[in-house]
Amino acid sequence: MNIYIIGGGSSGWMTATTMLTKFPEAKITVVESPDVPPVGVGESTTQYFRIWADYVGLKDEEWMPACDATYKISVRFSNFHDVDDTPWQYPFGAPNINLAHPDVWFWNQYKRGWSNDKFARDYWVAAECAEHNLLPIKDPNFKLKKNTGFHFDAVKFANWLRDNKCQSVNRIIGRVDDFERVGDEIKYLWIDEKQHEADLYFDCTGFTSLLNNSEWLDYSCLLYTSDAADDVAS
């Protein structure tokens, strides 16, 4: 199988790592544009990132130091209900009690006039630990290898995957000039005026959506929330 991935960055090299894990005998090529640098923002994940990391064989002690990574156990929201509102935590993992009927707890909170986010502070050790930049490693309900997300440098992470997990992946620094379709399928790519053919193509060019080549639809008239901000506790 011949696979081409258009676009590098964390999405491109995560795709390459995934395909290499699934199809170790495949010929995989990542095409990176010399004109488009990877987006150099910090990356924040939930605990579900672990599922992928386990699948491709990432070990925390190997990649985290190289990518300025820290563990994340909760998401902290400030001014979520009202301006100057008390911040609240959205912790990962399971609560420290078994609730057969959590709806009873929420109804009780409502009748008392208390906010629902008090639920997390009362029943998740992780919520309190996050306020103090601690990990609840002694909590039997907390699993380090399951209940943590990450913060990391996205550019360093992409480079680490490229250099440590994708040594057998071919890398082309070039521009995709055009591509040819046969029906709904892409048949050829033209990269720096040279023709390339693959069995499977991945578009990792972000909003450019180079291979999809479809019209951008504006939904701002329907989506009234145009901004989002949060503090992430780690």
Predicted regions and their residues:
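N-terminal Rossmann-like FAD-binding beta1-loop-alpha1 element of flavoenzymes
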Residues: I3-P24
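Glycine-rich FAD pyrophosphate-binding loop
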Residues: K22-V41
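Dinucleotide-binding Rossmann-like beta1-alpha1 core, especially the glycine-rich loop
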Residues: V41-E131
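A conserved short coil-to-beta-strand element within the FAD-binding core of flavoproteins
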Residues: I173-E185
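Short hydrophobic core segments
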Residues: E197-G206
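Flavin (primarily FAD) binding-site architecture
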Residues: T205-L217
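Single conserved hydrophobic/aromatic residue that forms the stacking wall/gate
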Residues: Y224-S234
